[in-house]
C-alpha cells in the first residue's frame, strides 16, 4: 500500500509556498513560442517491426502481473493513518488521522486506494492509483481529491534493500494564482506486514526542500 493524502500536501503548500516569484498573466504570449515548439518537436524514430508471434509474446510479457504487482497486492486492506503535517520548516506539527482502503483492480495490475479524513475541521476524500510498468520498470502513481481539479502524477523506483520507493513529480501551487509548479518528493517505506510510513517533501519559503508531511500507517485488524 502506499498513498499520500494530497489534500494535506496542497494545504501545506498554501502556507509554505515561495511567493518571491513575480506573477505573470495566463494570456501572456512570447513571440516565437509556437515556432520554437514546432522546430523542437521530436519525431518518432523508425524501428523494425517484429513478427506477429514476437509481438504477441512481448505484449503478453508487458501485461502479465509480476513480483512487484504481488507486492502491491499484499498491501490490500484497510489502514489507519496517523498524520503529522508541518506548515513551515521547524514549526510544530499539526496532527490528524486518516483512513485508506486499498484493493487491486483489473486482474491484479493496479492498486486503487480510497482515502478519507479531516483537515482543519474540513472533510476530505482522495483517490489514488498505483501501477508498476513492466516495460519502463517504474512505479507510476496518480492522485485526485476534493481539494483541487487536477491530477498529480509521480514516478520512481523501488529499492529492495531499504524496502522503499521514492517517487517524484510536480504539483500546482494554487495559492500563487499563476499555475506555478513546485517539486514534490515522496518516500514510501515498508516497516513490516502491518506498518508503513509515507514521507512527503517539498519547497519551503527559501526554496529549500523540507519534510511537509509524514503518515504512519497501521493495518486495521
Give the location of each predicted region.
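C-terminal motif of bacterial Sec signal peptides marking the signal peptidase cleavage site
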Residues: 15-17
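Edge beta-strand at a domain terminus
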Residues: 193-221
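Positively charged n-region of N-terminal signal peptides that target proteins for export
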Residues: 1-4
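N-terminal helix-cap/turn-to-beta initiation motif at the start of protein domains
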Residues: 63-80
Amino acid at each position: 500500500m502506499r498513498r499520500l493524502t494530497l489534500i494535506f500536501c496542497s494545504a501545506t503548500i498554501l502556507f509554505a509556498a515561495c511567493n518571491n516569484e513575480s506573477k505573470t498573466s495566463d494570456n501572456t504570449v512570447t513571440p516565437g513560442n509556437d515556432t520554437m515548439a514546432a522546430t523542437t518537436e521530436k519525431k518518432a524514430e523508425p524501428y523494425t517491426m517484429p513478427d506477429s508471434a514476437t509481438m504477441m509474446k512481448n505484449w503478453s510479457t508487458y501485461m502479465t502481473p509480476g513480483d512487484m504487482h504481488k507486492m502491491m497486492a499484499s498491501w490490500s486492506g484497510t489502514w489507519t493513518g496517523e498524520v503529522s503535517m508541518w506548515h513551515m520548516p521547524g514549526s510544530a506539527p499539526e496532527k490528524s488521522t486518516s483512513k485508506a482502503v486499498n484493493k487491486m483492480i483489473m486482474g491484479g495490475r493496479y492498486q486503487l486506494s480510497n482515502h478519507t479524513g479531516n483537515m482543519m475541521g474540513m472533510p476530505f476524500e482522495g483517490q489514488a492509483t498505483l501501477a508498476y510498468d513492466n516495460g519502463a520498470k517504474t512505479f507510476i502513481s496518480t492522485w485526485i481529491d476534493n481539494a483541487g481539479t487536477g491530477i498529480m502524477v509521480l514516478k520512481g523506483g523501488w529499492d529492495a534493500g531499504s524496502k522503499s520507493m521514492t517517487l517524484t513529480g510536480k504539483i500546482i501551487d494554487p495559492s500563487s494564482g499563476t499555475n506555478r509548479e513546485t517539486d514534490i518528493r515522496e518516500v514510501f517505506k515498508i516497516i513490516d506486514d502491518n506498518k508503513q510510513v509515507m514521507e512527503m517533501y517539498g519547497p519551503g519559503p527559501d526554496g529549500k526542500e523540507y519534510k511537509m508531511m509524514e503518515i504512519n500507517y497501521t493495518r486495521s485488524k
